[in-house]
Swiss-Prot record:
One GO cellular component term: cytosolic large ribosomal subunit
Keyword Membrane: no
Domain of life: Eukaryota
Molecular function, one GO term: RNA binding
Annotated GO biological process: cytoplasmic translation; negative regulation of neuron apoptotic process; ribosomal large subunit biogenesis
Protein family: Belongs to the eukaryotic ribosomal protein eL14 family.
Biased composition (Basic and acidic residues): 146-157
Lineage: Eukaryota, Metazoa, Ecdysozoa, Arthropoda, Hexapoda
Keyword set includes Repeat: no
Record region (Disordered): 135-166
Name listed for the protein in its UniProt record: Large ribosomal subunit protein eL14
Length: 166
C-alpha cells in the first residue's frame, strides 16, 4: 500500500507542539522542505508559518486553490463537513479518551477501578460456569492443535475438503 499522506495544499494536519497543540489546520502553501503556511479558520488558528516537525498529517484533504485566502479555506472547510468527520475518526476518539482519562481525580480513578473489578468478577463467574458445564458433559474443549489433527485425518481419508476440490 503506497504512502498517501502527502504535504500538499488542502491537506489537514493536527498540530502536535507549540501554542496550537491539538488543533486542526489546513496546509495552504509549502514554503520550503521544513515549513508550511497553515490556516485554521474554524479552529481558531490564524494564517501563519508552521514547522512540519510540529504537524501530524491526517488522511483528510479539502479542495481549494493554491494560496487561497482565508474566506475560501473557510468555505471549503464547511462544505467538506470536516468537523463531523474528525469527531468520529479513531484518532480523535483516542485523543478525547486520553484527555478524559488525564482529567480524572482520585475518586474517579477509584470508581473506575471498582467498576473494572466488578466487570472482571462477572466475566470470571461466567467463564467458570461454562468450564464446569463442559467438564460435567464430558465434552473436551476444542483446541487448535486437536482441530488441525482432525483436519489432517479427514484430508487423508478424502473427506470434505477433497470432495470440494473435485
Amino acid at each position: 500500500m503506497p504512502f498517501e499522506r502527502f504535504v500538499q495544499t488542502g491537506r489537514i494536519a493536527k498540530a502536535s507542539a507549540g501554542p496550537l497543540k491539538g488543533r486542526l489546520v489546513a496546509i495552504v502553501d509549502v514554503i520550503d522542505q521544513n515549513r508550511v503556511l497553515v490556516d485554521g479558520p474554524l479552529t481558531g488558528v490564524p494564517r501563519q508559518e508552521y514547522r512540519l516537525n510540529n504537524l501530524h498529517l491526517t488522511k483528510y484533504r479539502i479542495k481549494f486553490p493554491y494560496t487561497a485566502p482565508t474566506r475560501i479555506v473557510r468555505k471549503a472547510w464547511t462544505e467538506s463537513d470536516l468537523k463531523a468527520q474528525w469527531k468520529v475518526s479513531p484518532w480523535s476518539v483516542k485523543a478525547q479518551n486520553i484527555c478524559k482519562r488525564s482529567s480524572l481525580n482520585d475518586f474517579d480513578r477509584f470508581k473506575l477501578r471498582y467498576a473494572k473489578r466488578q466487570r472482571n468478577k462477572l466475566l470470571t463467574i461466567a467463564f467458570n460456569t461454562l468450564k464446569k458445564r463442559t467438564k460435567a458433559d464430558g465434552t473436551p474443549r476444542v483446541l487448535k492443535k486437536d482441530r488441525r489433527e482432525r483436519l489432517r485425518a479427514e484430508k487423508a481419508k478424502g473427506g470434505k475438503k477433497a470432495a470440494a476440490k473435485k
